[in-house]
Each structure stands twice: as structure tokens, then as C-alpha cells.
């Protein structure tokens, strides 16, 4: 999950949207 955050999104909000 954290690996994806470093892939593109920077904030938790972006991570949620990317998921």
C-alpha cells in the first residue's frame, strides 16, 4: 500500500483515489 504512495500519489487522498 505504501509502495503505491511513492509510485505516484503523495498524499493519502491521492492514494485513496488511485486505489
Swiss-Prot record:
Q: What is its EC number?
A: 1.2.5.2
> GO molecular function of the protein, one example?
aldehyde dehydrogenase (quinone) activity
| Catalytic reactions of this protein | an aldehyde + a quinone + H2O = a quinol + a carboxylate + H(+)
So which cofactors does this thing need? FAD
Coiled-coil annotation reads none
- Keywords for this protein: FAD, Flavoprotein, Oxidoreductase
Cofactor annotation comment: Binds 1 FAD per subunit.
Q: How does it assemble?
A: Heterotrimer composed of an alpha, a beta and a gamma chain.
Protein name, entry field: Aldehyde dehydrogenase beta chain
Organism, scientific name: Comamonas testosteroni
Starting at the broadest rank, the lineage of the source organism is: Bacteria, Pseudomonadati, Pseudomonadota, Betaproteobacteria, Burkholderiales
Amino acid at each position: 500500500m505504501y509502495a503505491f504512495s511513492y509510485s505516484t500519489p503523495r498524499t493519502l487522498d491521492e492514494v485513496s483515489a488511485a486505489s
